[in-house]
Amino acid sequence: MNLKLWIVNILTLIRIIGTIILIPIYNIYGGKVVGIVSLICYLTDSIDGILARKWKVSTFFGALFDGFADKLFTIINFIVLYLITPYALIPIIIEILIIIIQMIKFSRNLNIQANVVGKLKVWVLAIGVVLTFLASDIDNIYFLSLEIKNFVLNIPDNNLYLILLGPAILMELLTLLSYIFEMFFPKNIEILTNKPSKIKIPKLNFEEKKDYIKNVWLSPSFYEKHKDDTNLRDLRKLSKKN
């Protein structure tokens, strides 16, 4: 694996590590520090994608690894937010439904890449989540003026958190609906105009298959060739040992 590919995957790994430490950090340091950690994790989500495309090191492993990190981070983040406001339960439920829908699409051999709505959702979530954490611990944000702190503190908690998380909840719902639409109406313009190629699975022995899997999952050229294929079930078969 070349250095650039390592860097991209390490950035994704940082997000997973950040996810694991969110709850203990919140219990020890409160919302301000968790908000900062969340912001760093959201930035790695953007940076690793930008670098992967710029350096042309996108792979199927990276795409799945990144997707797993995103979902894990989002759900754990909202679980921590649930300790602050019950409104956080709504996006948790929607995220679980999105995962189920994506699994169904995958089982039907449909493309499970994030669409435009899903990509926009990430940034709306980032803003809402970070601001909610910071607002919950605003007394400990020392660089803010007393006027700003008093203004925020005078807003009832339910109203404040609904204002901050409302757009994120709306984007979660729109993303879910868009994926449901794609599941029932998969023949969109892209598929109609670009017929997907067939990923052929050669007959290999166990050792050869291991090498082939490595080349498939970690090969940027293979990813670029097949990233828009709808027949991803063939790729899934390559990951099986039997």
Task: Tell where the protein language model's regions lie, with residue ranges.
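Membrane-embedded alpha-helical segments that form the functional core of polytopic membrane enzymes
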Residues: L3, I10-L64, N77-I96, I155-L174
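Mobile beta-alpha loop/short-helix "lid" or hinge segments that flank ligand
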Residues: I94-I99, S136-N140
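Active-site-adjacent helix/loop segment of glycosyltransferases
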Residues: L97-I101, K121-V124
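C-terminal membrane-associated helical module and adjoining short loops/tails
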Residues: M1-I7, G35-S38, Y42, L110-N242
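Structural signal for membrane-spanning alpha-helices in multi-pass inner-membrane proteins
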Residues: T19-Y26, N77-L81, Q102-F106, V129-S136, ...
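Small-residue-rich segments of transmembrane alpha-helices in multi-pass membrane proteins
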Residues: I20, F65-F78, G118-F133
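C-terminal ends of transmembrane helices
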Residues: G49-K54, Q102-I112
